Amino acid sequence: YNNAKLFSETKLFLDWYAKKYISRNKRLNINIAIKKQIKFLLSKLKLKNNIFVHRDFHVSNLIKCKKQIAVIDTQDALIGNGAYDLASLIDDVRFKSTKKFKDRIYNYYLELNKRKINEDIFKNDFEILSVLRNMKIIGIFTRLAVRDKKKIYLKLIPYAWKLIELRIKDNKIFDNLKKILDFYF
């Protein structure tokens, strides 16, 4: 899993969502601005791409098996950034939860891994990957609604926006992206 793959996936936001909701004459500007921000954010990732990443790690792909949790739907798994799956689980658009609950899961993960990770570096990557992943999801859900006529996915897009807002509001690294999103959306 590399930055080129992450860029390509995040670009689905532009390819489907922006294309549907932004007028043609404004689209070129937003495409340039957001692509620049995606590249900037990807350049700020600090963890190595060196662990198993499920990539679709959310509540719907977890099942209880005896007294353990099993993961299903692993066909998209790759080697990637260690913060990606936690971002997928905590900021899952299919499962609304409070910030307090999200923080509890996040802090529990940090506690379990305190000797293995630098908390500042991990938080940086977690927030970047959450934002990029939710932009990708907005694009995918728009594609499912437009191309495949699966309109049910549209109802999840507002929560994906809330998750993006949650992650970008207090982190200066997102200042330019926030301005762009606020202006156009």
Q: What is the meaning of each model-derived region?
A:
Residues 150-151, 156-185:
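Regulatory N- and C-terminal appendages and interdomain linkers associated
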Residues 28-32, 60, 103-105, 149-163:
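Short alpha-helical "patches" and their helix-cap loops
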Residues 116-127:
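Acidic, serine/threonine- and proline-rich low-complexity regulatory regions
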